[in-house]
Amino acid sequence: MKKNLINKNNILLLIIILFGAILRLYNLNWDNGYFLHPDERLYINNSNISIPKTLEEFLSPDSSLNPNMFYYGPLPLYLYKISNSYIFTSMSLLITSRLVSALFSIFTIPLIFLIGRKIFSEKVGLLSALIFTLSIESIQYAHFNTTESILVFLLSLILFLSIKVVKENNFFYFIPLGILLGFSYAAKITGLVFVIMPSLSFLILFFSKENLKKIFFWGFIFLILTAITGVILAPYQIFDLSHFLREQEYMQGVTYGKYKPPFTIIYEGSIPYLFPLIQILPFTFGFLAFPLSLIGLIIIIKKYINQKNIYLLFLIIFPLLYFSWAGNWYAKYARYYILLFPFLAIWAGVALSKLKNIYLLLLIPLLIINALFFFRIYMFPNTRVTASHWIYQNISSNKIIASEHWDDPLPLSRSDNDQVKTFTSIQLAVYDPDSKEKIEKLAIDLSISDYFIISSRRVYFSIFQNPQTYPQTIHFYQLLFNGKLGFEKIKEFSFYPFFVSDNFADETFQSYDHPPVLIFQNNKKFSPEQIINLISKTN
């Protein structure tokens, strides 16, 4: 037994897992505890939950266990709270929750290996595990206490067990599959789409002329376990149904473009399918790994056509169905496509496995370097944190600082090492549709401001995507950036992990952990009338 465990492939897998752990666990306090990811604030702000004292209280929508937040499922919050209360008691809830997220991402690595080995070979399994380990967004989201790492783990485990059902002809795997689908639903309502993989197992068994009574019996067990687990882990999606449906309707409306809050209009005019293929996945999965994955997909499809290997369907059906759905959404957040990563990793692993060792020795270091370039983000202070320190050191107290609404104003709250200073903050309502009143108010606010600080490209990139709504606001930004509005750019804090600007990537890939911060000083002090005249000179 010991001899079987200590072999070259197992040692390589252990090295890959340890390397993945370093990439995911290093500097979980990357933002100095400022909650710079808005979804993290959502979890922390709703973390004041506790066990109800009575059954009546438990069943009530007003229960102390109800997080009163249904944009995401409650499972991650419950996991974070339990871990912080009983395991990692010396840590803050923020760091504990990031640690749990990172651990789920680490646990996914051996699962990718097992899937690759189950369908292909140990070589494919190892290469696939390495590709996933080095995937940029899996490293990034391991540093956030959001649902993504948990969902990717559950997806990978469901994929693995769905394959085992068919390969081993073992129906008992439908028991954990039903439970895991319930977990996925409790993590995020999107997790219900993972049912595609167990359903594929059922279909394969059905057409293989298995005992139909047996198939329907286990199908019933699977559905019952999914429902029971989902209700147990997310009870208030039933007990507080109206609240749940209301928030889900809003979130679905945002996703499909029925509702367009300011933080989504950056996707106005983005081309379905091409946007994630060009402006998301090369950055989030890897500049080299992503094209390798597409080559691997072609190899897998050809292999299925030639050999009719039914197990390959598990690597084709879900990702293509999911992408055909999510790639057409109005809001194309980078995180939506992280559910493709287990499949992309295996596709890329298949492509790499076809190469001679000499080419692997050339490509693998390039894949590692790409990941390490991004990893540097967590080796240096966050740009917003650094900018805030600079503000406390270099801007006099009582100055008026303007910022954009719907983005994080700077400076952040003072740290122990910063000087004690107070500033007056003004938020410019640039997202309001252009009107005479808006431009007049904008001009007044700018005229009295000593500084204007842009803490990410989120707002002005959104504005530039909507010229019909914001012709004058676009001209305002053009004047600002060209130094013609009386404001001079005196400082920029940016960290581009790949040494060149990643502004072409989806905004959400950049704005949380490495946003460019621009600081403008009002040197000429134009009057409101002068500013209005400048902004109004546009067609």
Identify the residue ranges that each predicted region occupies.
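Short helix- or helix-capping micro-motifs
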Residues: 20-23, 128-133, 160, 181, ...
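C-terminal luminal/periplasmic domains and tails of membrane-associated envelope-modifying transferases
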Residues: 373-376, 384-539
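Short acidic/glycine- and proline-prone juxtamembrane loop motifs at membrane-interface regions
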Residues: 137, 143-150, 333
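Transmembrane-lumen/periplasm boundary regions of multi-pass, lipid-linked membrane glycan transferases
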Residues: 43-54, 69-74, 78-79, 85, ...
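Transmembrane-helix motifs of polytopic, lipid-linked glycan transferases
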Residues: 95-119, 157, 161, 295-298
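Transmembrane-helix signature of polytopic, membrane-embedded enzymes
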Residues: 16-17, 91-92, 112-134, 167, ...
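Specific aromatic-rich, kink-prone transmembrane helix
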Residues: 111-115, 150-167, 176-181, 343-347
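Membrane-interface transmembrane helices that cradle and orient dolichyl/undecaprenyl
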Residues: 119, 158-174, 184, 206-209, ...
